[in-house]
Amino acid sequence: MVDSYNSSEASHRALRTSQQALERHPIATAVQGFPDDNLTEIRADLAVERWGTERGSATLTVHWFAGETPDAYSEFEFHYSDGETDFGWHHHEQGHVDGRGHFQERTGDAGYTYEPRTFQAQNPAQLSWEIMSLLSSKLYFE
């Protein structure tokens, strides 16, 4: 018997995998998934001062949708925010860029700016580490 695909369960598994990866990252001080029984969001508190960057209340929020079918593209966003800025790496349809992958950023009351982006990682755990590396570089060079 073949198991039927459930996009909600697949999304939950992807988020749980991302949560576990972020819990192992030395910058993440607390990582929580909501709601616990069927994750739709992960929030990580980040100690970015360990990277030599002074920011207040730094968080990374992760959303993941595995797609309606096993062959569908996964859609995700890893979105960083603190008292000064918010930006993120996203993979979903967006009218401002060609393709699915993009980086978006907003400072203050200004609207978002968008840049196309490709991702090297092929699974949620690897992608979580890739995003944390991108985040480190982004904060270091600001």
Name these PLM-found stretches:
Residues Y5, Y73, Y80, Y112-Y114, ...:
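Sequence-level detector for tyrosine residue identity
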Residues V48, T61, E84-D86, Q126:
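Intrinsically disordered regions, especially transient/low-confidence alpha-helical propensity segments
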Residues E9, D82-E84, T118:
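Generic alpha-helical secondary structure signal
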Residues G56-W64, D86-Q94, R117:
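Short amphipathic beta-strand/extended segments with alternating polar/hydrophobic composition
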Residues G67-T107:
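Short, internal acidic amphipathic alpha-helical interface segments
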Residues M1-D71:
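Negatively charged, low-complexity tracts enriched in Asp/Glu with abundant Ser/Thr
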